[in-house]
From Swiss-Prot:
Keyword Transmembrane helix: yes
Recorded metabolic or biological pathway in which this protein acts: Lipid metabolism; fatty acid biosynthesis
Homology family: Belongs to the ELO family. ELOVL6 subfamily.
Provenance organism: Gallus gallus
Places the protein is found: Endoplasmic reticulum membrane
Keyword terms of this UniProt record: Endoplasmic reticulum, Fatty acid biosynthesis, Fatty acid metabolism, Glycoprotein, Lipid biosynthesis, Lipid metabolism, Membrane, Transferase, Transmembrane, Transmembrane helix
HAMAP family: VLCF_elongase_6
Catalytic activity entry: a very-long-chain acyl-CoA + malonyl-CoA + H(+) = a very-long-chain 3-oxoacyl-CoA + CO2 + CoA; hexadecanoyl-CoA + malonyl-CoA + H(+) = 3-oxooctadecanoyl-CoA + CO2 + CoA; (9Z)-hexadecenoyl-CoA + malonyl-CoA + H(+) = 3-oxo-(11Z)-octadecenoyl-CoA + CO2 + CoA; dodecanoyl-CoA + malonyl-CoA + H(+) = 3-oxotetradecanoyl-CoA + CO2 + CoA
Name of the protein in its database record: Very long chain fatty acid elongase 6
Major location category of this protein: endoplasmic reticulum
Function text: Catalyzes the first and rate-limiting reaction of the four reactions that constitute the long-chain fatty acids elongation cycle. This endoplasmic reticulum-bound enzymatic process allows the addition of 2 carbons to the chain of long- and very long-chain fatty acids (VLCFAs) per cycle. Condensing enzyme that elongates fatty acids with 12, 14 and 16 carbons with higher activity toward C16:0 acyl-CoAs. Catalyzes the synthesis of unsaturated C16 long chain fatty acids and, to a lesser extent, C18:0 and those with low desaturation degree.
Regions that span the bilayer: 34-51, 70-90, 111-131, 137-156, 159-179, 197-217, 232-252
């Protein structure tokens, strides 16, 4: 196991965190993510059915608080993990930043790695607001939530290579995305270009994810990266499907609407 630990000032809760207990718990309980996913899917179909004949709920204030909470969490996660990844990348190179496993057990990053994985369960709550407010629920939304939850819990238990990249990227994108959601829910008018930027960031994240998987597979053949073929296959399928779905969403939401508007004019 390659170890490269960046010394950062730790908060007390980061010092007290026991990563060994966390990893053991996930090894014993990761399959519960399937139960959460099943309950989530049941809520989606059951909730939409119940709301068919009911008036929508506004829930503006709860939505602001929800989005703001996730934005703050993601910002802290990005601020605490990005310096680690940047340090490894600049001092040890790309290969070490991908293959290094100390992200899971390092003084600061260990807490945020586990917090990231656990956060994928409460993030399912995003959909509750969509259902109760009777907004359009697209396939990408719930498919993304379910698969990220399953893959995150499945991968954390094995401390697979590439995890530092995956988690840090997601923290960064979510920091911007949930901040945008909070502003919109609070009634602020935000430029359409900002929403386009977020989607482009997500598309870029998926491309980088595919590249990381390729690198892990290549270096794994030489015993330099800790992972296994099954994980890489699932991860690659997941990132490729995200890439296709987010590209389709970008075209439908921004390019397609603009083209239709011009034809009408």
């Amino acid at each position: 196991m390659n170890m490269s630990v960046l010394t950062l000032q730790e908060y007390e809760f980061e010092k007290q965190f026991n990563e060994h207990e966390a990893i053991q718990w996930m090894q014993e309980n990761w399959k519960k993510s399937f139960l959460f996913s099943a309950l989530y899917a049941a809520f989606i179909f059951g909730g939409r059915h119940l709301m068919n004949k009911r008036a929508k709920f506004e829930l503006r204030k709860p939505l602001v608080l929800w989005s703001l909470s996730l934005a703050v969490f993601s910002i802290f996660g990005a601020v605490r993990t990005a310096p680690y990844m940047l340090y490894i990348l600049m001092t040890k190179g790309l290969k070490q930043s991908v293959c290094d496993q100390s992200f899971y057990i390092g003084p600061v990053s260990k807490f945020w790695a586990y917090a990231f994985v656990l956060s994928k369960a409460p993030e399912l709550g995003d959909t509750i607001f969509i259902i109760l407010r009777k907004q359009k629920l697209i396939f990408l939304h719930w498919y993304h939530h379910i698969t990220v939850l399953l893959y995150s819990w499945y991968s954390y238990k094995d401390m697979v290579a590439g995890g530092g990249w995956f988690m840090t990227m997601n923290y960064g994108v979510h920091a911007v995305m949930y901040s945008y959601y909070a502003l919109r829910a609070a009634g602020f008018r935000v430029s359409r270009k900002f929403a386009m930027f977020i989607t482009l960031s997500q598309i870029t994240q998926m491309l980088v994810g595919c590249v990381i998987n390729y690198l892990v597979f290549s270096w794994m053949q030489h015993g330099q990266c800790h992972s296994h073929v099954q994980n890489i296959i699932w991860s690659s399928l997941m990132y490729l499907s995200y890439f296709v779905l987010f590209c389709h969403f970008f075209f439908e939401a921004y390019i397609g609407k603009t083209t239709k508007a011009r034809k009408v004019d």
